[in-house]
From Swiss-Prot:
Gene3D superfamilies registered for this protein in UniProt: Phox-like domain
Pfam families: PX
Superkingdom of origin: Eukaryota
Keywords, ordered alphabetically: Endosome, Membrane, Vacuole
Family to which the UniProt record says this protein belongs: Belongs to the YPT35 family.
Entry text on domains: The PX domain binds phosphatidylinositol 3-phosphate (PtdIns(3)P) which is necessary for peripheral membrane localization.
Membrane topology, from the record: Peripheral membrane protein
Record has Membrane as a keyword: yes
Name of the protein this chain belongs to: Endosomal/vacuolar adapter protein YPT35
Protein's GO biological process: protein localization to membrane
Length: 167
């Protein structure tokens, strides 16, 4: 055989070292986005808020207080949800903190208006517990407030909202 037609044999170690020099192909998702682009374009966000049952908690020195169960769903995934238990005062404080950031007289965008809360009742907890209608109206008011705050993308990105959800 002629030396021009002789097949060339590669050295195995030489091939492996050349493979190691080749950069990996960047990962692309189905729509052509890179992994970095996908993470920037598809940040986690709250997609549903449900205020559920109230729970009566026995506090220090026998004084009781009420908490509300709040289920927050992330990215429309039931398995990606957070369940919080918050007192009315904590929700009230969230509103006060939002009003400091988004004052009522400074509405550049109408979606940034901080919604109102149902009024705080000064009646004793025992008397309130007797009124199931009052509790349901309170739950509906909290549902309305939290939905309007937590589902608003501007409020969602606010540090006080993140702190409320994560604490």
């Amino acid at each position: 055989m002629n030396s021009d037609t002789t097949p060339t044999h590669r050295n195995k170690s030489n091939s492996i070292s050349q493979l190691n020099k080749v950069l990996p192909v960047p990962i692309e998702l189905h729509n052509g986005e890179s992994l970095e682009q996908h993470q920037q374009n598809h940040l986690n966000h709250i997609t549903n808020v449900i205020v559920g049952e109230y729970h009566l908690i026995s506090g220090e020195f026998g004084k009781s207080y009420m908490t509300w169960q709040i289920k927050i769903t992330i990215n429309d995934l039931d398995y990606s949800s957070i369940v919080l238990y918050k007192r009315y005062n904590e929700i009230y404080q969230l509103r006060q903190d939002l009003l400091k950031i988004f004052p009522p007289h400074d509405h550049t965008i109408t979606t940034n208006i901080v919604p109102s809360l149902p009024p705080k009742d000064n009646l004793s907890l025992d008397r309130l517990m007797m009124s199931k209608n009052w509790l349901e109206e309170r739950r509906k008011g909290l549902q309305w407030f939290l939905s309007n705050v937590l589902l608003n993308p501007v409020f969602q990105n606010c540090s006080v909202v993140k702190q409320f959800v994560l604490s």
